Amino acid sequence: MVMLWGCGCASHPPVLAKEPRKGETDMGFSFSAENVIPVIWFRRGLNRSTDIGLRIGLPLSGSGIDVNRILFRNGSRKWDALNLAYNVSPNSSFDLTYYKFKKAKKAKRGEMPSVSWIGFRGMFIPYGISKNQSQRFGILYGRRFGKRYGFELGYNHDFRSMPLSQIVNLNWDPK
């Protein structure tokens, strides 16, 4: 079981579910099933549409660098962003993720409104743990509650390892 998990793991940048501000730096920790050990991250706003991120994991697994760019704003509550990332892990990868964010209409007094998002990710692993290349595509959903807590769930599928039509087939034989 651990071998199956280890062969499939990769690392992804944590999303900062707010619009960037020039010169503002945010810091936090992310916990994931992929990395086991928490990863510390930093995000710095370059302007009102772009920020750059750095992640540091021990032992380097989960580390990486990424850049976010807001592509569209739809009023004060919705925006679309593109994230480009390089990740260091057993399956080091290049990621491209398209996010659609939506901020709640109102928040509790004195708190930040919650933000939810859906994302579409493409990932290229040039030299994975199994010594092969991999192209994965997936979908993810996330939500931030207030300023400190949030979650993200997703699925990335490697079409070379299993046909998409066989995901729910419990009798599928990879031979």
Predicted features by range, described:
Residues 35-39:
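Beta-strand-rich domains and repeat architectures in extracellular enzymes and scaffolds
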Residues 23-34, 46-60, 65-89, 113-128, ...:
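Transmembrane beta-strand segments that form the barrel wall of outer-membrane beta-barrel proteins
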Residues 1-5:
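Sec-dependent N-terminal signal peptides
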Residues 15, 20, 89-175:
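Outer-membrane beta-barrel transmembrane domain signature
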Residues 8-9, 65-70, 166-175:
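Outer-membrane beta-barrel "beta-signal"
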Residues 40-42, 64-67, 95-98:
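A short acidic, amphipathic alpha-helical/loop segment
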